[in-house]
Amino acid sequence: MKEIKIKKPIKIRKPTRSYTGIMWITNGTNKKYLAPDFDNRCAYCDDSDEYSGGYNSFHVEHFAPKEKFKHLEFTYDNLLYSCSYCNISKSNKWIGSNENESVLGNKGFIDPCNDDYYNHLGRDQNGNIISLTPLGEYIYYELKLYLKRHFILYNLDQINIRRRALKAKIKEKEEHGEDTRKLVKVHRLVCEIFCDYYDLLVKEEA
Ligand SMILES: [Zn+2]
């Protein structure tokens, strides 16, 4: 059996809904509150909207589908900020016979605001999303979490964190009149890697 080393959780941070129990009756208003609650990241795959079409391309996802549970269409506790890929893949899939029955056996979905989500999905050392359990495998395939774009966007994000930190360090050294040549070289290299991943993303979307 192939050994998988888990290095990281699927998401940088577990999101929390700040407006539990509240209902705004437009998705536009809900989305304004969902974006910061979810750190401008897809609830399921953690893609940042920064390199992925921005706020306008992200969707308001209904955990329990609104086609089956009309009364939950604007219930904040049922809503998620989601990339179009996960939202469209999930569509109106729902295994249970009522709104509270999101899992039956090894099939179904878990709300990523729930701790249990992180027991079923993770990331390997390269940033690929991996399933950890049979239920995780169901979610992985149903949401198409195997798409290459998720791996590319994760790495773009990680490289960008390093790029920004290096830039800040160079600025700090410059202010103290220190030699920055080595750091500038590393920064240039990191920028080149960033561009390589960006090209990959553009190719993937073409
Ligand atoms: Zn997503």
Model-derived segments and their meaning:
Residues G28-K32, D115, R164, R181:
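Generic alpha-helical secondary structure signal
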Residues C42-C45, C83-C86:
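Short cysteine-rich clusters marking metal-coordination/redox-active sites
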Residues D47-L79, K90-G105:
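Histidine-centered nuclease catalytic patch
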Residues K90-A165:
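Domain-level detector of nuclease and nuclease-like folds
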Residues Y138-A206:
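C-terminal, charged low-complexity interaction regions
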